[in-house]
Amino acid sequence: MNTETKALPAWLDKVRWDDNGLVPVIAQEASTNDVLMFAWMNREALAKTIETQRAVYYSRSRKRLWFKGEESGHVQHVHEVRLDCDEDVVLLKVEQVSGIACHTGRHSCFFQKFEGTVDGGDWVAVDPVLKDPEHIYK
């Protein structure tokens, strides 16, 4: 299926898209269940993800499809796609190529952990940088 020339499939209508035609997406490492990242998809991105078995998101800032790893090489091979009980969040179970999902060079975008109390806490980076971002993006 080429989503650029054909009508999008009817199964996409089951997803509860927001007013902007987007749905939140969580990418999870299939082998470890680590939560890697959060992003958005539109209908075309979800259809392309199913078609190619590689994660394709929608970039709200660039207003275009974002093929994960198109610049960094850190693609996500999709093993499974799930829809939550309210049909308004998508979960991708992926294999993260190179182990780096975050643009900061870390395994996960969720590398900051809150430590402390409501009166005196802060966010602390608890996961290491695996590769300097300046060497990832050229």
Curated annotation (Swiss-Prot):
Its main location: cytoplasm. The keyword Aminoacyl-tRNA synthetase does not apply. Pathway: Amino-acid biosynthesis; L-histidine biosynthesis; L-histidine from 5-phospho-alpha-D-ribose 1-diphosphate: step 3/9. The keyword Transmembrane does not apply. It catalyses: 1-(5-phospho-beta-D-ribosyl)-5'-AMP + H2O = 1-(5-phospho-beta-D-ribosyl)-5-[(5-phospho-beta-D-ribosylamino)methylideneamino]imidazole-4-carboxamide. GO terms for biological process: L-histidine biosynthetic process. This is Phosphoribosyl-AMP cyclohydrolase. It comes from Burkholderia ambifaria (strain MC40-6).
